[in-house]
Amino acid sequence: MGFNNLVSLAALIEKVFPIRYTPAGISVLDIILKHESWQKENGQQCFVQLEIPARILGRQAEEWQYRQGVYVHVEGFLAQKSRRSLMPMLRIQNIKEYKG
């Protein structure tokens, strides 16, 4: 199946968990992103608020481990949170500070 799974989101880094490492030595940083915006749905304005868990791997994990409270623009894809949970987690592939 060739379905797209692409996410682009501007959000606040609400919480940063301690960095950890895989057995292969890859840095893993779990964060919580908080997003608020007005969207148009069915011709009406709709206020959207959400928090979503997200994960950053590798060099970017090291760079963002002390950036709680920063607004960012992220791009990535949705995946299951763990082998035992089908709850979604945003897997971040690109992250940069949001300048508005």
Swiss-Prot record:
One GO MF annotation is: single-stranded DNA binding
GO BP term (any one): DNA replication, synthesis of primer
Write the record's keywords in alphabetical order, separated by commas.
DNA replication, DNA-binding, Primosome
Q: Which domain of life is it from?
A: Bacteria
User: Domain SSB, which positions?
Assistant: 1-99
- Any Pfam family from its record, for instance, is SSB_1
Which Gene Ontology cellular component annotation is one that this UniProt entry carries?
A: primosome complex
Q: How does it assemble?
A: Homodimer. Interacts with PriA and DnaT. Component of the replication restart primosome. Primosome assembly occurs via a 'hand-off' mechanism. PriA binds to replication forks, subsequently PriB then DnaT bind; DnaT then displaces ssDNA to generate the helicase loading substrate.
Q: What family is it from?
A: Belongs to the PriB family.
Q: What is known about what this protein does?
A: Involved in the restart of stalled replication forks, which reloads the replicative helicase on sites other than the origin of replication; the PriA-PriB pathway is the major replication restart pathway. During primosome assembly it facilitates complex formation between PriA and DnaT on DNA; stabilizes PriA on DNA. Stimulates the DNA unwinding activity of PriA helicase.
> What is this protein identified as?
Replication restart protein PriB
